């Protein structure tokens, strides 16, 4: 005697029946166990006398290669067909159960800071090192969010020389002329509205060993300066102009920051 267990899940409205086990004997008789209480209005799904359809052909190939194998002769009655309305009701109920939960709406990102740093101290710096000079200039730009912005500079130098840091329009020509470095053309005055807000310079002198000859003593001047400009919008763009003069070194440099990275409206240089 061999026993095989078959698990079939049948959805019959409104009760679910689980056919748990079928004990098969050599005589071909089957004993079926059902869980749940059957109703008189429902037909038995598995019977021995039904001749409608056999699935033994589908399962016989699995047991032919085994000794003392027994062909299975499981039969079932054709179930009662559902009406079209019943199918639509079943699909509607299953869809309602599988509907995903609505996603929570994300809150927009709100900027809480009043000030927006456009350029930090590390975004702009100029470092000059010579035998007689060690110069470092750093700057930053801060947008106040009220139509104005400030430009800050700090400068540290050890040695002798003159350093000038100023704001100029992009049309400023780079040249070795101290008299021309702070001149603003009349056509640029409307788009360039800046004034000095704060300025402080600290100087100290000392005698130290010379870099080029440690056996000698050199006179060194240490200078620390802080300056800030307050500018009003609208403006096109401002540039930073640095000029340095000493006995052995000259430098003139103009740097125009990239405002397209921070501005919603792109800047198109002209002139």
Swiss-Prot record:
Source taxon at top rank: Eukaryota
Keywords on record: Glycoprotein, Secreted, Signal
Residue ranges, annotated region (III): 98-176
UniProt region (V (Cys-rich)), positions on chain: 186-271
Matches recorded under Pfam families: Neurexophilin
Region called II, residue ranges: 22-97
PTM notes: May be proteolytically processed at the boundary between the N-terminal non-conserved and the central conserved domain in neuron-like cells.
Any one GO molecular-function label of the UniProt entry: signaling receptor binding
Keyword Glycoprotein: yes
Main location: secreted
Localization, UniProt: Secreted
One biological process term in Gene Ontology: modulation of chemical synaptic transmission
Residues of this chain annotated as glycosylated in UniProt: 23, 68, 93, 146, 156, 162
GO cellular component terms given for this protein: GABA-ergic synapse; glutamatergic synapse; synaptic cleft
Entry-linked InterPro entries: Nxph, NXPH/NXPE
Family: Belongs to the neurexophilin family.
Function, as annotated: May be signaling molecules that resemble neuropeptides. Ligand for alpha-neurexins.
Name of this protein: Neurexophilin-1
Native species: Rattus norvegicus
Lineage: Eukaryota, Metazoa, Chordata, Craniata, Vertebrata
Gene: Nxph1
């Amino acid at each position: 005697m061999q026993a095989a267990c078959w698990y079939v899940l049948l959805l019959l409205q409104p009760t679910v029946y689980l056919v748990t086990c079928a004990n098969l004997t050599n005589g071909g008789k089957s004993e079926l166990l059902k869980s749940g209480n059957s109703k008189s209005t429902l037909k038995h799904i598995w019977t021995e006398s039904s001749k409608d359809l056999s699935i033994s052909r589908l399962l016989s190939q699995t047991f032919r290669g085994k000794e003392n194998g027994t062909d299975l002769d499981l039969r079932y009655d054709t179930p009662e067909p559902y009406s079209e309305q019943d199918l639509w009701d079943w699909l509607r109920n299953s869809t309602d159960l599988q509907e995903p939960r609505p996603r929570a709406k994300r809150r927009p990102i709100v900027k809480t800071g009043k000030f927006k740093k456009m350029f930090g101290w590390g975004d702009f710096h100029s470092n000059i090192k010579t035998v007689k000079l060690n110069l470092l200039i750093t700057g930053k730009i801060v947008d106040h969010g009220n139509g104005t912005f400030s430009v800050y500079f700090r400068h540290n130098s050890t040695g002798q020389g003159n350093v000038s840091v100023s704001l100029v329009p992009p049309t400023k020509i780079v040249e070795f002329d101290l008299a021309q470095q702070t001149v603003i053309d009349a056509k640029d005055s409307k788009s360039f509205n800046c004034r000095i807000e704060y300025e402080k310079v600290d100087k100290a002198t000392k005698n130290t060993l010379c870099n080029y000859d440690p056996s000698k003593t050199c006179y060194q001047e240490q200078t620390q300066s802080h300056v800030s400009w307050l500018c009003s919008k609208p403006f096109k763009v401002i540039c930073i102009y640095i000029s340095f003069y000493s006995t052995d070194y000259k430098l003139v440099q103009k740097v125009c920051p990239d405002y397209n990275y921070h501005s919603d409206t792109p800047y198109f240089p002209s002139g």
